[in-house]
Amino acid sequence: MRPNKDRRTEIILYGLLLIPLLFAAAALAQATEQAQGLAEITAALSVILNNPAMLRWCASTPKFLLAVLVLYPLAVYCYMLDQADRHPGAEHGTAKWGNAHTLNLKYRNAKQPAENYILTENVRFSTDSHAHKHNLNIIVIGGSGSGKTRFYVKPNALQLIGSYLFLDPKGELTRTLGRIMETKGISVTVLDLVHFQGHYNPMAYLETDEDAIKLAFAIVNNTKPKDATSGGDKFWDDSSVLLISALILYLMYEAPASEQNFSTLMYMILNCQVSENEMVENPLMMLFGELERRDQQHPAVLQFKSFMLGAKKTLQSILISAAANLYMFNSRKFAEMTSRDEMFLPRMGLEQRALFIVLPDNDTTFNFIATMLYTQLFDQLFRLADSTPEYNGALPVHVRLMMDEFANVALPKNFKNILAVCRSRNISCDIILQNIAQLKSLFKDDWEGIIGNCDTLLYLGGNEYGTYEYLSKILGKETERTKSQSIGKGSRGSSSDSLQTAGRELCMPDEIRRMRDDECLLLMRSEDPVIDKKYNLLHHPNVKYTPDAGGEPYVMPPDYMGDAVTITMDAVAAATAPEITEEMYEQLDYLEKHPEENYYENEENFSQYDQGD
């Protein structure tokens, strides 16, 4: 595409050219009146042009001037119209390499160097998105061993800008960054899903009925097998959501804070055995019956009545399905971890905090906890920014999510929309991937929308052809001059040379593959791409406080409690739920294979409560 030229400049230049043309027209008019014949007219015109003082107004001067004023603009218009469709030197593309130092001068915060993101060795990116009109969402792509943590995550964490959430496989970031962040006055909280240390209770953040239903959906959707997509599975999922949301709403409105946790939830499910005898009520039915007598429109009652529309056999199967969704809470350590909360998610937008979520790199069983935390963090921060008038819709402290292992943790269903609007709330996301294939697998047809909501892409290297091909394509084509030569042999030999233009990718896929290990490729919206050195971690002034430069690592004490809270788990909630029996699983399996027995006594009534996806 041809760069847009300033048409005003062109028009001014053509207008200035009109002045000598009008003078020449007036001179020609005078010459035609003074002389006869072409030779004499030419001689007279030459004399007048060489001596402008001799120019005089004559009878034919207006005609000549009018002709110029009509024909000249018409000629200029035709010429500009013709040139508009020509792209000299850019017939095949205008892609070209940018300069890292030029890019840095444009986007850095020179007055406050600490208020910059570190992209490459020579490029800094100001956190003031209003100054450069770019969002702060960044996609980082790099294969295993390309240095995503060393060359990008750690240097940016050491900038100590605002609050951070880290997904931390194996706990490396916690050990490296925890001590310096505490030293610099940043509150450090760790949720360790490897050693089950720290405490996070999703029920601590329930404020509305919608929050409770959303949490129930998150539990069911993130604890089922990834390949569970059949219609029967949807039936069980929706039914489980009805039951779990009813129980969560009951705890939210009726239980003390110490009992609002997953252990109590599991305990309630296991005390809801449905009998074939309709005259026999289980403890849970009695509990909700008492609540209904007090308030028939209680949200928990409405959800529970929707669940109870099912046939007895079906209800028992749904109970088993719901218990299966919560089976991990049978673990004493996991039940204890979720018994109370010390994450204090809204505070991340009010004061500098660092939250490390330590994940096992070889087991994704408990990664759904990170998913729920993601969902609730976005909800809490958006709500805080939007509901506090003095914040004007933006959090006072910037919150940055460093989403390593992005592909291994399920995301909120509306993540694409969150990414599009988080900038206005002073939130940014660093999406860290191994290759483009991971993004395509996660978002199917919407994967390009994720990249579209990130104004910066940093490629650190890898060994996946699809990524090479994608990058080569978006880098564009340049126009090259080629020289062709032909030589004719024989008694009358001849040769000819010709210059032509041809298009070539700015960087071919194989050239991207051969990038040096210490180089990276940076693409920013509206800017030419840059190849620069990866940032050297040892050049950062704060690295001396980390184990990478001989500093002391951060070690979580065995009795780690984070920001200690006073609530304790109720005796009922502390009880370890019994294991789900093999007989219960067999019954559920039988009903899944015989869907004709899975029915609600009143399908029309049930349909109005179907929550859908």
Language model features with spans:
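Basic- and hydrophobic-enriched, low-structure N-terminal and domain-boundary segments
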Residues: M1-S146, R150-Y152, K477, G488-K489, ...
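Extended alpha-helical interface modules used as scaffolds for assembling large macromolecular complexes
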Residues: E505, K544-P547
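Conserved ATP-driven motor cores of ASCE-family P-loop NTPases powering translocation/secretion/packaging/pilus
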Residues: L419-L521
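Short secondary-structure boundary/capping segments
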Residues: I180-E182, Y205-L206, D445-G449, K473-E478, ...
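Flexible domain-boundary/linker segments
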Residues: N261, S339, E390-Y391, L439, ...
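P-loop NTPase motor domains
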Residues: F23-A26, H134-I427, L442, G452, ...
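A broad, low-specificity signal for short, low-complexity segments enriched in glycine/proline
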Residues: K96-L105, A114-E115, L119-H130, R150-F151, ...
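Short loop or secondary-structure boundary microenvironments that flank
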Residues: L359, D363, E405, L433, ...
